[in-house]
Amino acid sequence: CLQWGVFLLPILPIFGSISIFLGMILSYRHQFKSIRKNPVNQGLAILSILLVIISILANNSLESFLGLFNFIPYFIMFAGLSEIIQTPSQLRQLSWLMIFGAIPVIILGLGQQYLSWSGIDILQGILGWSLQLNGNPVGRMSSVFMYANILAAYLIIIFTLTLGLLIEEWQNKAENNDGYILNKNQKITLLIITLLLTAIDLILTNSRNAWGLAVLSSLAYALYLGWWWLILLVTTGVTAVLGSAFAPSPIKDGLRMIIPAYFWQRITDENFVRPVETLRITQWKFALNLAQTRPLTGWGLRNFTPLYEAKMNVWLGHPHNLFLMMFAEIGIPTALFFMVIICWILSQGFLLLTNSLTNPSERLVYYSYLITFLGLILFNCFDVSLFDFRVNTLSWIILSGIWGVVDNTIGNSTKNSYN
């Protein structure tokens, strides 16, 4: 069920979510005792209670209770799925399924931008999406997602996992028994094509955030593998692009003859005149002010938007920073408690990578999940992706896999110590 759900989620989110839900239910049915005793799940249960209390005390309780659906169902899903995703081999299979599921998204995005594809509105109730002509905002690829930045967050997941699988297949002389009919060369070819098309789509989302994260994920693999030549190459390229945007005039002018204007114009934002109310720095200051005004309980989930609109006369769905949003909406103590849980999971993941995983192929697959989730964290420093059901679901599945492998390893070590 879970595998079908992961595959179908991007293009058929309703059917994908049902499959994932059924997989989660089966996990609870067979592993409820283990789920209940897991310390991370206990922490998430406490966090859920705190969020309910905060919603009762919120400035707008109705909005805050609606906001619970962006958190508590995913805590429940995490607890169930981390009991059934427990090996690097399973992570590899899920990576392949995410990549196969992304291919239609990538193709539809290219059609949207270059072939003026649009519509399918009549099937929106079944598909859960429609294709907007020339993207949203116009000129920025959004494919099957509501907005270009959400597509960018999704593509960062696909780009990072695809790059990890490509490196693994390239290095691995033996065939992986992953259950697919493709041979090694066919898999490498498919991964290269998918990676290139994903990179093109990332560029066409016009998301500076995603561009930077694609570079950082590439550097993360290069550092892990000790590929200093690639680090030098990427660093040189990034320096040239940034120089074309911000270097002093003689240097900048020369670099702009080499670097396409598409990049440095977007980085400098010089083609856009933005009202002060729409600037990220303005939103961040407002969110900080909200956090300082009600530091203990916050203003309630989804309360940033009406408060900002009342003050600035501009509607914004979020302050373009997940952490500042949480400080403002659920209070500093609860937000920090949430962050501690996530940091604990990731720290245990890196300890597992360092101390317990010995198979190079398994280490690389697990590492790809760690840096994918870290990439999502960095993405949410300049945007907020949790309001999109599909990206949020994939994010929690990735975290479930990270913790599931840790929990399984700890369990096996405990059993061995008693034998």
What function would you assign to each model-found segment?
Residues 20-23, 49-52, 76, 92-137, ...:
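Alpha-helical transmembrane segments of multi-pass inner-membrane proteins
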Residues 270-330:
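Long extracytoplasmic/lumenal interhelical loops at the membrane interface
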Residues 107, 113-116, 204-205, 222-271, ...:
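A membrane-periplasm/extracellular boundary helix in multi-pass inner-membrane enzymes
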Residues 330-377:
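Hydrophobic transmembrane alpha-helices and their immediate junctions
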Residues 1-66, 76, 86-92, 96-99, ...:
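Transmembrane signal-anchor hairpin modules in multi-pass inner-membrane enzymes, especially those
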Residues 22-27, 215, 367-419:
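Transmembrane alpha-helices of multi-pass inner-membrane enzymes
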Residues 12-22, 63-69, 209-211, 228-234, ...:
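Short, aromatic-rich membrane-interface segments at the entry and exit
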Residues 2, 130-144, 278, 314-325:
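Juxtamembrane membrane-water interface segments that cap and precede transmembrane helices
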